[in-house]
Amino acid sequence: MILLADPDPGSRGELRTVLEQAGHVVTAVATGLEAAQVLMQTVPSLLVIDLDLKWLSGRQLIELLRHNPRTYFIPIVALGGRVEDLRGIPLLLRPVVPRLLLAQVDRFLTGASHDGGHL
């Protein structure tokens, strides 16, 4: 299961559709708090997190995940509006190009060799 956290309903729906059409099971949420609640109940295969989530930003969520032995290993793809250093986590700039998102997802979920993105 991929956990998608995106505050924009239109973008969230579009990205969810792209991922589902590629054969992935997706749980989509709008806030960092909702993402944290999902993560307390299940461990997804991959996180796609917007950096500008409400009530718990994407950056804060990433830091929490890095310090939790239950979640530190989950790969992350970040979404954002500007280039930032996320210490090895791939960042897709908005507007997200679907093929680039799918390339990152496939990179992590197919076990292909990579050099970052894990917590």
Q: What does each model-identified segment do?
A:
Residues A28-L46:
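Acidic, metal-coordinating helix/loop segments flanking the phosphotransfer/catalytic sites
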Residues P9-T27:
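Two-component/phosphorelay signaling modules centered on CheY-like receiver
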Residues Y72-V83:
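A short, hydrophobic beta-strand element within the central beta-sheet of small alpha/beta folds
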Residues D6-P7, R94:
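Acidic di-acidic motifs
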Residues V96-G117:
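C-terminal output helix
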Residues A28, W55-L56, P95:
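Residue-level signal for the "D+5" position in two-component response regulator receiver
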Residues D50-H67:
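Conserved phosphotransfer microenvironments
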